[in-house]
């Protein structure tokens, strides 16, 4: 696997797109999931300069919890790191991943309670391509959910290289 984010297509009995699992990074503040995701992403994609949560929070964060306002900060993050973003309902995620995951990890901020939570998607698998694997900075774990679960937790913001 190269450091530029090239995905590996699974063949044989496996179906889907698998990227190198990113390092597990735990968020350091209540709302700094976005910064932990970008730090993790920068460690596996040489197209993004190495980042730390602390620097990202200092530069882009808002307030003591380290959160951001997506409507203003997502475009700023995209500009700073050469990313592209989209906002859509959850049902579009599967198609988006099929189109872009082979070329880039995908930052995904979905609705969790009354706030948004960011994760870094690195795999789309299963016979129907409905299993989404991601690095979750809430505890710093690798987890998975179905595309249906993401659909139920939309709308969402996604970013890719």
Language-model features: locations:
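Active-site nucleophile-adjacent alpha helix/oxyanion-hole segment immediately C-terminal to the catalytic cysteine
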Residues: 2-64
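Conserved active-site-adjacent core of cysteine acyl-enzyme catalytic domains
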Residues: 4, 44, 54-161
């Amino acid at each position: 696997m190269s450091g530029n984010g090239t995905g590996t297509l699974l063949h044989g009995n496996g179906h889907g797109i698998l990227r190198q699992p990113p390092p597990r990074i735990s968020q350091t503040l209540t709302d700094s999931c976005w910064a932990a995701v970008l730090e993790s992403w920068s460690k596996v994609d040489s197209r993004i300069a190495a980042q730390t949560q602390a620097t990202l929070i200092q530069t882009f964060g808002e307030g003591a919890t380290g959160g951001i306002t997506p409507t203003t900060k997502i475009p700023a993050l995209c500009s700073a790191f050469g990313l592209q973003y989209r906002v859509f309902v959850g049902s579009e995620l599967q198609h988006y991943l099929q189109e872009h995951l082979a070329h880039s990890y995908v930052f995904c901020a979905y609705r969790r309670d009354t706030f948004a939570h960011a994760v870094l998607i690195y795999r789309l698998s299963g016979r129907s391509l409905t299993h989404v694997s991601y690095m979750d900075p809430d505890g710093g774990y690798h987890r998975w959910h179905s595309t249906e679960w993401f659909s139920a937790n939309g709308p969402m913001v996604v970013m890719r290289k």
